[in-house]
Design a protein with these regions (language model features):
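Short, hydrophobic alpha-helical segments
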Residues: 88-95, 186, 190
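Active-site-proximal substrate-binding core of FAD-dependent oxidoreductases
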Residues: 71-75, 90-117
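FAD-site-proximal beta/loop scaffold in flavoenzymes
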Residues: 2-3, 8-89, 181, 185
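Glycine-rich flavin
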Residues: 63-64, 95-99, 193
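Flexible, glycine-rich terminal cap/loop adjacent to redox cofactors
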Residues: 19, 110-117, 126-196
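A short alpha-helix-loop-beta-strand transition element characteristic
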Residues: 34-38, 94-105, 130-134
C-alpha cells in the first residue's frame, strides 16, 4: 500500500517511484563553465564546454534536440557513448558531424517492452509544434507466427505537413524494431506518406 501525504492509504501490488535525473554540475560550476538553460552543462556540437580546453559528455550536458531545435537533457547511455566518441574524435582533430538527438529509448519492465523515439504530443505542443497522433494496435510479428504478440503503438506527426515527430510502443514482444523504423524515418525527415 501507499500512504499519501494526506494520510490516505491506497492499495497497490507494485509501486514505481520515478523521480527523474538531475545533472550533477557542481564541478562544472566550480570550474566556471557555462550552464545552459536546461540546468546542464552547455556544450558545442563536438562537446567542448565554454572553456575550450574542457570537453563534457553524458547526463550532465545539454544535447541538441533535432526536432525542437533547442537544447535538451537526455540522460541515456547510448547517446552518452556517441558523445564520448564525438568528443574523442574532436580532441584528436578528426572532423565529425553531430546532427543532434531524437531521444530513442527502450526498457523492459514487468514482462512488457516499451520503447519511444522523437517527441510525444506534450513535448511537441510545449514547443509550439502543431501536431496530432494516431493510435493503433498490431502484432509484433506476422499474425500467423505462433509467438506473435500485440503491440500498442502511438505515432505523433506534425499538422499539416504530416512530418513524423515521434512514436511510443508497448507490448510483450519486439516493440523496439517498430521504433527503430520510426527513428530512421524521423532522421530522414519522413512523413506519413512515407509509411504507406
Amino acid at each position: 500500500k501507499v500512504i499519501l501525504n494526506s494520510g490516505r492509504e491506497v492499495a497497490a501490488d507494485t509501486v514505481v517511484l520515478a523521480i527523474g535525473v538531475v545533472p550533477e554540475t557542481g564541478l562544472a560550476k566550480d570550474a566556471g563553465l557555462e550552464i545552459g538553460e536546461t540546468g546542464a552543462i552547455k556544450v558545442t556540437a563536438d562537446y567542448r564546454t565554454s572553456d575550450p580546453h574542457i570537453y563534457a559528455v553524458g547526463d550532465a550536458v545539454e544535447v541538441y534536440n533535432s526536432l525542437t531545435r533547442k537544447p535538451a537533457k537526455l540522460p541515456l547511455a547510448g547517446p552518452a557513448l556517441r558523445q564520448a566518441r564525438t568528443a574523442a574524435n574532436a580532441i584528436y582533430g578528426i572532423p565529425g558531424t553531430n546532427k543532434g538527438v531524437y531521444g530513442s529509448c527502450a526498457v523492459r519492465i514487468f514482462g512488457f517492452n516499451a520503447a519511444a523515439t522523437g517527441l510525444n504530443e506534450k513535448t511537441a505542443k510545449a514547443n509550439n509544434i502543431p501536431c496530432d497522433s494516431v493510435y493503433t494496435m498490431g502484432m509484433d510479428k506476422v499474425g500467423i507466427m505462433p509467438d506473435s504478440s500485440p503491440i500498442h503503438f502511438k505515432l505523433v506527426y506534425e499538422v499539416p505537413t504530416g512530418r513524423v515527430l515521434g512514436a511510443q510502443a508497448i507490448g510483450r514482444g519486439n516493440v523496439d524494431k517498430r521504433i527503430d523504423v520510426i527513428a530512421t524515418l524521423i532522421a530522414m525527415g519522413g512523413t506519413l506518406e512515407d509509411l504507406k
